[in-house]
Design a protein with these regions (language model features):
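Membrane-embedded transmembrane alpha-helical bundles that form the catalytic cores
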Residues: 1-201
Length: 201
C-alpha cells in the first residue's frame, strides 16, 4: 500500500480504506501471494488515454511555461504590470498542468494494473468561490488536510478567530506541501486569506 508506485510522486493521496479492499481482491487466499495481474483491454485503453492527457499537461504545457514563469519571478523588479500579471496567469497554468498531469499519469497507470485511484482535479479554475476551488483542486490533499488537520484543530466549531487561525494554518501547510519555496508559502497564505474572507462575507 505505502509503496504503490504510480501515486508516490504527487498523488492522488490514497487512503488505506479506499485502496486495501482493491489490493485484497488481488491476493490469493491462503498463500497470501499476489495474483497474476490481468490487464483488461478496456482498462488499457482508458488508462493510456488518461496517461496521454497527463503527459500532455505536464510536458507540453507545464514544462514549456516554466521558463517564462521562472524568468519573471526571478527578477520582477522593473517589469511592467502586464508582464507580472502574465507571470501570475502562466504560473497558474504551470502548477495546474504539473500537478494534475502527474496525477493523471498515476491514475492511468494504476487503472492499467486494475486499480482505481480517485479523481484529483475537477476543473478548479471554473470554481465560483475559494471554497469551491478547494473542493476541485488536489481533492485528495484537500480532504486529507480537512480530516487530519483542520477538524482536529477544531475546524469551525470554536470561535471565529480560531476558525480563521485554523484556515491559515492549514493553507500555510498546504502551500508547503505543494513546494518548499516562498512562492508556495505565499500562495498558501493567500488562499488562507481568501477562504477567511469568503467565510466572513
Amino acid at each position: 500500500f505505502v509503496a504503490f508506485f504510480p501515486q508516490l510522486v504527487a498523488g492522488p493521496i490514497v487512503r488505506a480504506s479506499e485502496f486495501l479492499p482493491q489490493l485484497r481482491e488481488k491476493i490469493e487466499m491462503g498463500s497470501g501471494n499476489l495474483k497474476q495481474i490481468i490487464i483488461h483491454n478496456s482498462n488499457l485503453k482508458l488508462g493510456i488515454t488518461i496517461m496521454a492527457f497527463g503527459f500532455l499537461k505536464k510536458m507540453f504545457f507545464a514544462d514549456n511555461i516554466a521558463p517564462l514563469v521562472d524568468n519573471i519571478f526571478s527578477n520582477p523588479i522593473g517589469m511592467d504590470s502586464f508582464t507580472i500579471i502574465l507571470g501570475a496567469v502562466a504560473f497558474g497554468i504551470q502548477i495546474y498542468g504539473d500537478f494534475s498531469g502527474y496525477t493523471d499519469i498515476a491514475i492511468g497507470a494504476a487503472l492499467i494494473l486494475g486499480f482505481k485511484l480517485p479523481m484529483n482535479f475537477n476543473k478548479p479554475y471554473f470554481a465560483t468561490s475559494p471554497s469551491d476551488f478547494w473542493r476541485r483542486w488536489h481533492i485528495s490533499l484537500s480532504t486529507w488536510l480537512r480530516d487530519y488537520l483542520y477538524i482536529p484543530l477544531g475546524g469551525n466549531k470554536k470561535s471565529k478567530n480560531r476558525t480563521y487561525l485554523n484556515l491559515m494554518t492549514v493553507m500555510f501547510l498546504g502551500g508547503l506541501w505543494h513546494g518548499a519555496s516562498w512562492n508556495f508559502v505565499i500562495w498558501g497564505v493567500l488562499h488562507g486569506i481568501y477562504l477567511a474572507i469568503h467565510k466572513l462575507v
